[in-house]
Amino acid sequence: PVGYRAPSWNHSPNTLTIVRKMGFLYESSLMHDDRPYELVQNGEATGLVELPVDWILDDAPLFNPRGNSYMNPRDVMQVWIDEFDKAWEEGTMFSLTMHPHVSGHRSRIVALEGLIEHITTKGGVWFGTHEQAARYVRGQAGMD
């Protein structure tokens, strides 16, 4: 692996130190920004790219049938389309957190297909892995 995402996005006081010692390229558990950025530890640049996450881009809270947050898949699709459109206008990354046991159901797959269909109508979009995104960010920021 070249990156790390903490389970449930929970960090301990030691997480960043451990991730750095492991030599990872990126970390993806923090919500400090909408744009990728370089993590700093104790005032020192780490060379580690943060690919930020956000609750609105996580399928689990939106499809939680045990809580009061369950949404219709087509409504979730529209939320994600709106989130994508603003990210596209701003020229930044759009990254969903998806769980196969959450978004892998038929009606939710239809919503995901609708989102992908919408995304592919926009110019200048590329689908990539977190590794590819982190390498792109490093190159753009002169971190290599």
Specify the residue positions occupied by each region the protein language model found.
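Active-site-adjacent pocket scaffolds in enzyme catalytic domains
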Residues: 2-90
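C-terminal domain-boundary segment and adjacent tail
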Residues: 26, 74-144
